[in-house]
Amino acid sequence: MKLNILKLLNNNNNKNMLLKNMLLKMNINNNNMNTNNNNMKYMNNKLQSINNMNNWSLQMYNYNKNNELNMMMMMNMMNKLLYKLMNMIMINNMTMNVNNKNNNNIIMMKPMYQYMMNKLNIKFYYYINNNNMNTNYYMNMLYKLMNTLNNNNNMYMNNMNNIMSMYINKNINIEMIKLNYVYNNKDIMNKYLSTMDIDTLNNNSTMNLLNNMMTKMNNNNIIMNYMNNMNNMRNNKYINNMSSNYIMNMLMYKYLTGWTILLKGRLNKNMTRTNKYILYNGSNKMNMYMKNNYKLNYISNNHFINNINNVNKNGKYNIKVKLSYI
């Protein structure tokens, strides 16, 4: 009788172990199927949902409206401080190089802010209009200055980082990125065009200048680079890591394929009607009138649009820039 009971218990234990092993294998298979389905979903998409920080100018956590308003006010104040810092560098540069002071110009985009619980990240792009040796020397000094700003040592208690930290009670990290080409950022390209003489933008010399700014495309090299990047992602298995921006950085927004510039306004007080000029090149030239993609209510995944309004002594004008990347 005892032997029969022991056999039954052993059989029950074996059955339980078999059931547990079967459930474990089923769970593993389900997890693998879910990960594969998610990967295929992202692969068939335009990859925009993978990059959570593709385009942002302000990221903050909000728990009440007063905190949001205070942060917006602090952001405007820090914008002015950063602009003054860049102006001081350029004024110092112009005093040391009087002959080229009319040619030196720093174009800076609006800084981007990322608020965290105990930290604030500030990032902005800038472009130097004149790349002579004197300007490069002083921009290297600016790099050293920015490293000083990010240093938390007690020796630099009076630096700008600590001064700005006193207003918001957070550690501040400032990251400045120099652009070698004006078309790398839509805001900087728009400001660059606004500094030019508007009356000469429709001339052939200006068109040649804009065409020379754009890189020469080689379709075979672009295709081979994309294929190599995709093969590298497969070999390194980065495609399973959806939390990072590796796929977006490797496959998108690497090559400028076209640009469009829209000029509209009255540059003479005696004019009764507004003039309108459209300059385009590259991939935007063929699709301008066929699909009418220039309207702001249709912004594709690889199109970046920015416009700027200005009033001067000759009248009012608007510049709208559209850049297309792949």
UniProtKB/Swiss-Prot annotation:
Pfam families in the cross-refs: VAR1
Cellular component, GO, one term: ribosome
Subcellular location: Mitochondrion
Name of the featured protein: Small ribosomal subunit protein uS3m
Family: Belongs to the universal ribosomal protein uS3 family.
Keyword Nucleotide-binding recorded: no
Entry keyword annotation includes Transmembrane: no
Superkingdom assignment: Eukaryota
GO molecular function, one term: structural constituent of ribosome
GO biological process, one term: translation
Taxonomic source organism: Naumovozyma castellii
